[in-house]
Amino acid sequence: MSKKAIKGYINLIIPAAGATPAPPIGPALGQRKVNIAAFCKDFNDATNGMEKGVPLPTVITVYEDSSFSFKVKTPPASYFLKKYAKITKGSSATKKEAMVGKVTIDDCREIAKLKISDLNTKNIEAATKIICGSAASMGLEVVGN
């Protein structure tokens, strides 16, 4: 049995159980002649058990026959960091000028455990450092050892 020929990939961030034919999903899929309603139904069914509105990076593989498959990844690190720090948005200023909140190193380690499948490392300590770097870029102070 031969594999289907891949026409392309679409990378989108879609809210959990919130796929609709409206932009950006509809136009992105429509350009590649994918059945938009079928994708929205399949995606919403696949993410139905998750908290509504959680942003999910999704990679949609489009095949030559206009069929598709998709892979849902874990939410972005910034989503978890904002949740742990109890803030709605990161700092718009440079790192040292305006810290908008605090997270502990243990919080970063917990996030790293959730995100390790999507990071470019399998070492939990390296993954923790990646998450701490994201926190610093958002204007969050990392406290603890």
From Swiss-Prot:
Signal peptide: none annotated. PROSITE patterns: RIBOSOMAL_L11. Keywords: Methylation, Ribonucleoprotein, Ribosomal protein, RNA-binding, rRNA-binding. GO terms for cellular component: cytosolic large ribosomal subunit. The keyword ATP-binding does not apply. One of its GO terms (biological process) is translation. Pfam families: Ribosomal_L11 (PF00298), Ribosomal_L11_N (PF03946). One or more lysine residues are methylated. One of its GO terms (molecular function) is large ribosomal subunit rRNA binding. Disulfide bonds: none annotated. Part of the ribosomal stalk of the 50S ribosomal subunit. Interacts with L10 and the large rRNA to form the base of the stalk. L10 forms an elongated spine to which L12 dimers bind in a sequential fashion forming a multimeric L10(L12)X complex. Forms part of the ribosomal stalk which helps the ribosome interact with GTP-bound translation factors. Belongs to the universal ribosomal protein uL11 family. This is Large ribosomal subunit protein uL11. It comes from Rickettsia prowazekii (strain Madrid E). The gene is rplK.
